[in-house]
Amino acid sequence: MTRKQRRLVFIGTCGAVLAVALGLVLWAMSGTIVFFRSPSEIAREAVAPGVRFRLGGLVEAGSVVRGPDSQVTFAVTDNAARLPVRYRGLLPDLFREGQGVVAEGAMEPGGVFRADTVLAKHDETYMPREVADALKKSGRWQEGAGHPAPAPPRTASGEARAP
């Protein structure tokens, strides 16, 4: 075998090994990938019970009901559709009605989303990109909503000064 042929065999072997390694990594990760869906998408597409996904939207006002043993039920909405959620555990401190939330879990046979993880927005301007995109797509996004007004300028002593 000539030097050129050995080099081509070596490069081909390395390429094949890398392709197999990449395939194994992707196959191993396929079980951990969780897709994001909005309540409107769930209403349009029938999701089989037991399929894990992330549900994102806003906590519907007046829907939070706290039960015994840290059980909480609430509804997630994107202002076009709503989906009831059941969760057992401690909710994040920033969880409240009208705020953005992402819950991870699976649908139950009765059409209720059983969440095992609930994430709440962490400040006044944050909303998960997927939630914002879903709200924009449904035409319910209000530009500038949720952004706090800028604080008035302050003097060195901490007093508010006129702008």
UniProtKB/Swiss-Prot annotation:
Residues 1-7 are cytoplasmic. It comes from the Bacteria. One of its GO terms (cellular component) is plasma membrane. The keyword Cell membrane applies. It is a single-pass type II membrane protein. Keywords: Cell inner membrane, Cell membrane, Cytochrome c-type biogenesis, Heme, Iron, Membrane, Metal-binding, Signal-anchor, Transmembrane, Transmembrane helix. Residues 29-163 are periplasmic. GO terms for biological process: cytochrome complex assembly. The chain crosses the membrane at residues 8-28. InterPro entries: CcmE, CcmE-like_sf, NA-bd_OB-fold. It is found in: Cell inner membrane. One of its GO terms (molecular function) is metal ion binding. Residues 134-163 are annotated as: Disordered. Its main location: membrane. The keyword Ligase does not apply. Heme binds at residues 122, 126. Heme chaperone required for the biogenesis of c-type cytochromes. Transiently binds heme delivered by CcmC and transfers the heme to apo-cytochromes in a process facilitated by CcmF and CcmH. HAMAP family: CcmE. Belongs to the CcmE/CycJ family. This is Cytochrome c-type biogenesis protein CcmE. It comes from Methylobacterium sp. (strain 4-46). The lineage of its organism: Bacteria, Pseudomonadati, Pseudomonadota, Alphaproteobacteria, Hyphomicrobiales. The gene is ccmE.
